[in-house]
Regions:
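Short beta-strand element of Class I
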Residues: 28-32
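A conserved beta-strand element that flanks and buttresses the S-adenosyl-L-methionine
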Residues: 112
């Protein structure tokens, strides 16, 4: 029996914009997201077994809700220096974490990534918008958010290259 290629979908979430059922006869899936409940719900919705569809959080860019909530509390009275310094600390903390991909080195034949890099730090940007903060008036914070996005995209690409043996889409 021929082995089906393994397709990893990075930032899969609930797969609301994907039709896994259409590809299921031809491939095996690995759904990657930091919210396990979402990717498990997607697998269940499509009626895929664990052999057909593995759900995993590779933890390559770990920012926790507590850090996001603390940033939200800073927004009330925090100035540009304090906001940017906090984001720098978060970024350094994440950068110090060395993700391990034990068991996943070159495990995927193909990786599919759409817009994930921009989502990795999106909550911080969303909070600034929610609180009516103008990034033009917060140049240090804007610069730090840009640097966080560069770091997140780099970490994502490193993870993809370690785990993918074939093409990246």
């Amino acid at each position: 029996m021929e082995e089906k290629p393994v397709v990893a979908i990075w930032g899969a979430g609930r797969c609301n914009d994907l039709d896994l059922e259409m590809l299921a006869p031809y491939v095996r899936f690995v759904l990657i997201d930091r919210t396990m409940e979402d990717i498990q719900a997607a697998r269940a919705r499509y009626g895929l077994s664990e052999a057909q569809c593995v759900c995993v959080d590779l933890r390559f860019w770990e920012i926790y809700e507590e850090e996001e909530r603390f940033f939200e509390t800073l927004l009330a009275n925090g100035d540009d220096l304090h906001l940017s310094e906090y984001l720098r600390q978060v970024m350094e903390s994440v950068a110090e974490q060395q993700p391990t991909f034990a068991g996943y080195e070159k495990a995927f034949d193909f990786s599919v990534v759409c817009g994930l890099a921009s989502q990795l730090n999106a909550r911080f940007a969303g909070l600034l918008q929610l609180y009516g903060k103008d990034l033009r008036r917060l140049p240090r914070t804007a610069a730090m958010m840009k640097e966080m996005n560069v770091q997140a995209a780099g970490r994502l690409m490193d993870a993809i290259m370690v785990t993918t043996s074939g093409a990246v889409f």
